[in-house]
Amino acid sequence: MRKQLFWILPSIIIITGIFLMFNQSITDVTEQPEANWSRGLEIGTTTVDKTFPVQETPGGNFIIQTYEQDKLRAQIFNHEFKQINEKTYDIPLDKWTRVFLNHDQLIYHDYNDIYDQDGDVIVSNAKRFYPLGSTILYIKENNLYELNPDDLSSTKIVELNKGMEDIIPFQGKKQLYFMTEQSLNNDVKLNIYELTDNGAKRVYSTSFQIDAMQTVEDTDFAVRDSNLAFMLETVQKQSQGSPESYTYVAKTSIGSNREPSLKPLTFPDPAGEGSLSEPNDITISYQNETLQLLFSANGFTETTYQENQAFNVYTATITDNGEIQSARKSNTAKGTVDPKRLNNSTVMWLEQGSERNNILISSSNPAVIDKASTLSQDDWLRALGKTFGMLAKVLITILATTIWFIWPVVFVVLMYVVKGRKLDEDISWFFYTGIVIYMLATFIFHDIIFIDGMFARAPDYLTFTGSSYIYTLFFALIAFIATQSTKATHDWHAPARIIYFAGAHILMLVAYFGPYYF
């Protein structure tokens, strides 16, 4: 055993460092988005990459539609997101198809005509189709209609302005609203209508001016009692690079004569420093009397190996004093699109894949938190990939430590030049002088290796006060014990033991600190 001590001792330290590195990788890739909020839980897959309707039943179950080639799958989940039932419908489906499903009644739109479940045409040449909770809106020939799912009759609601080809519906608790938006140059005009028995009643109208270089990309609105809020997402084209997006919000009330002002929003990154970038798929709603936005954005995450940036799901709450409070609702290295709120405690989104997209949810429901905490095969693979990437950093960090290693090597070479073969004799002062020179180099050039960025990235067990000096001295003691064992068991002379001491010490240190050097 003593003969093997010279490699067993440093090997134990290095293997322990690699194990801690892997454990840190597991911790990073499985980190919850925020306290008391679950990780993503996969509940299905779909072949399309856009909106999928969700219904919450009075009993607290969820009906989620997933799309496959020529097949609609309606899956029913309980409040713990355990699937309790499923039904499939054979209809032609692609990413343009929109479906109304209420109980067993199915009506769909193929971007041209509206059909019943048997494939019979109900309405031809319909430009737009809006499936809602218990009714359907559609646009045909510049007119907005309501389609009654029970008897398949159509009622004209309002004639839209020429050139207007889309509306934004909003299902309130008691009423159904829709918004029209018209943009001319940098003028944006918004009208809010309430659906009545006699058609549509305009309840609010306003206009905004945006920057002349910007164009409206998306709009949304929300109504709660008499409170009204608008969201505008604009894009400014750049002469070089990607277009820059901007988000604005305005708050007012129905019946108010005061013109609301657009407030530009910047979303702070709740998990990192600075702001979230490229917010998209933004929706606005009132949650517990407070205005809140749900969106996907690029923000900080430790689930990735190098960039520490990925698209995840976020909410932004706008307080009464105008403060913006962001919260992260997903934490994954994969791209997230089309986030959707199921209720106050659960959100859903698509995770893009090469052939199929995964449907995931996250929630504050304790049952979901527990269910989503299980490590998946993907978690293990991502943790292994991140660990191997960190090991690659260790190899590069070793190059930086040459500033330490070169000094004992130069000392040994110079002593051979001066003393020659006499150094092969057991000269204690030579060995200890070489060790002292190396240790002096580690302290003199301490800040070259132990940089501030390293401590910002490293875990807590490496960043306590004086940690770099404590680890340096502790590993020096281990290296010294292992080095001294070679004197009696392998008859190593002082030069070999000096070089071995420095090499073993460096390998042990970089196994712990190297992954966080850059």
Over which residues does each language-model region extend?
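Extracellular, repeat-based ectodomains that mediate carbohydrate processing or recognition
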Residues: R2-F518
